[in-house]
Amino acid sequence: MASRLANVAIGVVLAITALSPAWAQGPGRGRGAEPPPPYRPAAGAKDLRSVLFNWTWYMGMLRGVDEHELVSSLEYQGKGTIQVDGQPCTLTKYRVSTSYQVSGQRVQYTCTRPNGRTVSNIEVVNGEYAWNEDIPGAELVAGKGNATPMPAAVQERLIRLWASPQGAPKAAIMAAAPSAELGANPGTLFKDGEMKAGETSLSWENGKPVITYPIPGVPGATATATLNEKYMAERVVVKQGAKTTEFIYGDYKDWNNPLNKIDALYAGKVTERHNGTVARDLTTDQTETGSVYVIMPVPASVRAAIHPAAPETLPKFELASAAPQGQTPRRADGHPDMTGNWNSAGMNWRYGNRRCDPTQQEGCSRALNQTMDFEFEAPSRFGPNRPEYKPEFWDKVQQLDEWTNKDDPVMTCQPLGNPRQGPPRRIVQSDKDIIFFYTQYADGGGGNNEYRIVPTDGRKHDPQKAIEATYYGYTVGNWEGDTLVLDSISFVDTTWLARGGFFHSDQMHVIEKLTRTGNGIKYEVTVDDPEVFVQPWVMTPKILTLNTNPEAGILAERADCEVYETKDISSQIRH
């Protein structure tokens, strides 16, 4: 799988939730009972609510028992012809990496003109910035590649993104409910009978639903999407002044890797016309839906050259958590007391057995859907915040993600390690040290009731102790005001930072900061790895809340761990 991050500063603070509803658990807890869907259109419904729901539902974009819209990215490969400088060019390579969460897309192509000349280019857009690259990730590392600012191309590239088979329903929903939570089910956002919400409207023409919505980030650009009988876009027309861009789509099916069929549909035929002239005529070879590492960091030279005109029109994916309440308890030494049981942050949806959608293949079952959807729902697989690897490592991350069932260390019972383990479930603090207790199922799976004992007396790293590499690193702690700072070095290089192939070297350096305010702890992590990162990765902060349940501190004994799969992998459905 592939996925690409952008350097756009978008914060996503994840809300706290339960992992599994009762009906998704074991015997005696309702196993086999079918949960009610969050929304089911009435028979014959022709309002905006039902059409937007069906559009995403039939496309396979709704995931999990609550049927959230969780398709965050797409890797696309195709063939055909494109227009280059007014001449047709036959493609020998055409790859598109799209991140819907950051309004970003990278198009890499190589083609041959009628005169035999080969043309190659890399066209990138990230929000309000557009540029061309001579190599992927040009200029991110000093002296490697050249990035050419292309301010005049921003609007054309954003139109292509937000008029695409998956981008169009996303843009229509965002325009209809701009304040909706990240990944909301469209059926829960509107009222029955509405034909217009926000800037999105619905009409019916020749028995087909027609959705009209604005293109994000492109002032004055209005898209009209005509859906077929299966609620998939067959034609999207974007008008902006005197320019008309038309997209024709057909042959929808699951084009994902045969080893990772996840019933997420995409168009097999794509035709793009500019004022009637064919600009791109493509046939799909393969897609990877929901790729975890799709990034397009903006080079400094591009930021300096382009001055955004209307960034406020771009989608912002943000979730806020409640502010901590109450007084902050302190120890006799004056430091905040971290002792207690804590609820860690996860996503705001539930795992479970999703009902089969209308276009799923024969043999679909709720149990299969639960396995299939996990790669969309796992906390560290969602959200736009990604480490910025050096470009030469991008393909390695994608390949590790493709074979995560074989390569993820957790599949062979290795500890999650730091920082993947995440925040502790229980903390015991003394004058000279602090003890962290962890539970299973950190990172939405894995972990095995580990613990750490960290000195907090302000000592420095001892070079002799730093010789030995461990899963959680050699950690020392000190207080900076009311913030406890943990400094960790000397890691093994066999753990991952998160799901999705986020590997690291043995030069990784991790700084954790814990700040207690009232009944909450703000948990912040910065990861530096000069061997593989362009710059330190500041992970999305998590807010821990005090759990006052007297049973919360009772942790199960360390469980047995079973190696889940052998090297003979018959499926790439990611965990």
What are these model-predicted stretches?
Residues 225-227:
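Short conserved beta-strand segments at catalytic cores or DNA/RNA-binding microdomains
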Residues 19-24:
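Sec/Tat signal peptide C-region and signal peptidase I cleavage site
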Residues 10-13, 98-100:
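Intrinsically disordered, low-complexity proline-rich regions
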Residues 1-12:
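Bacterial N-terminal signal peptides that target proteins for export
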Residues 212-213:
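N-terminus-biased targeting/localization segments
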Residues 102-106, 208-209, 230-235, 254-269:
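A short glycine-rich beta-turn/N-cap micro-motif
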Residues 25-205, 216-217, 221, 238-251, ...:
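PEST-like low-complexity, intrinsically disordered acidic/proline/serine-rich tracts
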